[in-house]
């Protein structure tokens, strides 16, 4: 299985000012596999330490954080010398030993020659709870479920993924049905590595759903195990409300759908907890096209998407029959899967920020507003071959952006003020 994050890791390895690297991401998106695969591809030796199951290593970091002493202890543990130039040190589940997190500062300052990558389940929460490590002493990389392009590669369609990157839309159009069929599979399977691997090996959608259910059960167990007791019920209710939130025509998050009379201040900490552990994407509203969009973010109005389109379908109870119902999967519960899919592909790009737009009267809504740093791109999402874009036209007439994008099942087309980008090519939005 190929992950494009490997390319980012190779750039990190070659960097002149390399710092210890922390890989963030939701549970089961493949952080451990990625670190080990990177070690296999780029180093002669890998030292893997799992702090969740290694009390000896926890004891090593419990006292002195002198880096020479720590390296000596690691060498004694693995039984050989550690070559700093060609050995990858992997610290997994590092949140279990806060002193190990703190040691990254000293490795950066006193022993930068060592190549260290770290990860951990719910690490985002540990970092936001004030675990000691100084800002500026580490690098970060966010890992998400497989993108649609990675899914194509995992399912033996590497050439189709390459064609998307080449942006030869005339040729892409000629293979449209293959892209649509793969996109249907991706909506159902999603990008969680275990689910994708199961699909590749068996093609059994029932087995895929069983894996997704197990992942969702593990997430709910994490709520009880790791969240503060007082907010666990609110996290669970909020999490379970997301499919119904996205099934609305207007997908703005409504607290009243969690329970009658629910208020924002009761659930703010629950949203932050889910966001910190990578389980939800919070997409805030803007009401203008000013640069940077972050300066105009309305934190009170937002949409909430989950980490993976396959998990959303599982949460919503979508059955395998939807795969056989023409292109019905794309429009199930008011196109929620399609908007989730587009959000998920956009969030894979760390160099863009994603928002949505409504005017102050609420009479005009654009599904996503993408800030690339150079451009503000409004994006309207259509689940079928619907080429109407009334709200996008209103936005265009008000702000006159350089580029307006409608993404749908229709072929690529430049039509005056608007570009139609096929849903299966939405990954290319940041390169337009």
Model-identified regions with their sequence ranges:
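Pre-Walker A adenine-sensing motif
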Residues: 1-15
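Hydrophobic anchor at the beta1->P-loop junction of P-loop NTPases
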Residues: 23
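Conserved lysine of the Walker
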Residues: 31
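Hydrophobic positions on the alpha1 helix immediately C-terminal to the Walker A/P-loop
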Residues: 34, 38
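Structural recognition of the conserved hydrophobic beta-strand(s) that form the central parallel beta-sheet
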Residues: 90, 115-121, 142
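Accessory nucleic acid-recognition modules appended to NTPase machines
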Residues: 200-365, 369-371
